Amino acid sequence: MKTLLLTLVVVTTVCLDLGYTLKCNKLVPLFYKTCPAGKNLCYKMYMVATPKVPVKRGCIDVCPKSSLLVKYVCCNTDRCN
């Protein structure tokens, strides 16, 4: 009975994700990082003058406001940035 219970616990732990963690792209989208607790948004920062070339990507807790020179795009799904 103990073996059955232990097996059930192990299978449940393996099958269920015990804490969802967001994955965000780094500057080079081939690589990504797992965000720490509390950082539940991915972001991409780029210069307004060159919108096709991101300057920075990563995890963040609150999406910053864009300015006349810098634009931020935020999202909340895996590798969406």
Swiss-Prot record:
The keyword Nucleotidyltransferase does not apply. Pfam families: Toxin_cobra-type (PF21947). Disulfide bonds join C24-C42, C35-C59, C63-C74, C75-C80. Its main location: secreted. Gene3D superfamilies: CD59. One of its GO terms (molecular function) is toxin activity. Residues 1-21 form the signal peptide. Keywords: Cardiotoxin, Cytolysis, Disulfide bond, Membrane, Secreted, Signal, Target cell membrane, Target membrane, Toxin. It is found in: Secreted; Target cell membrane. PROSITE patterns: SNAKE_TOXIN (PS00272). GO terms for biological process: killing of cells of another organism. The keyword Secreted applies. Expressed by the venom gland. InterPro entries: Cytotoxin_Cobra (IPR003572), Snake_3FTx (IPR003571), Snake_toxin-like_sf (IPR045860), Snake_toxin_con_site (IPR018354), Toxin_cobra-type (IPR054131). One of its GO terms (cellular component) is extracellular region. Monomer in solution; Homodimer and oligomer in the presence of negatively charged lipids forming a pore with a size ranging between 20 and 30 Angstroms. Shows cytolytic activity on many different cells by forming pore in lipid membranes. In vivo, increases heart rate or kills the animal by cardiac arrest. In addition, it binds to heparin with high affinity, interacts with Kv channel-interacting protein 1 (KCNIP1) in a calcium-independent manner, and binds to integrin alpha-V/beta-3 (ITGAV/ITGB3) with moderate affinity. Belongs to the three-finger toxin family. Short-chain subfamily. Type IA cytotoxin sub-subfamily. This is Cytotoxin 2b. It comes from Naja sputatrix.
